[in-house]
Amino acid sequence: MSYITRTGNLAEAPTLREGENGPYCYARVLVSDRIRQESGDYIDGPTVAYDVAVSGSQAANLVDTAQRCGNTRVTFTGAYRVTEYKGEQTTRLQHEVRADGVAVSLRGQSVTVERRKASDES
């Protein structure tokens, strides 16, 4: 398993769930890299969808932000694995990340920070 940090846009607002260990969500984050051509120009590379598992107060804050703000650019970091699924006609890759950290990116959007009471953290 690898460890990665990526930045991309939420595909949709994730749904907050409650488990034995507290709140969690699965966020789909779409990432496109810029690729430099031989001419020096840049083009958008293929979009890769990452299924990011987020837990605790980070999950609650991510869901709240996505519901209030819509399409949100986020940075995530965590353990990464790729799973290959073979169908009859195609092969599909699933990119999964168990996030240690999730943050709202400041690129192309403004952010307001509200500090929570220590009793609200998990």
Name each region found by the language model.
Residues 1-122:
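Single-stranded nucleic acid-binding surfaces, predominantly the OB-fold ssDNA-binding core
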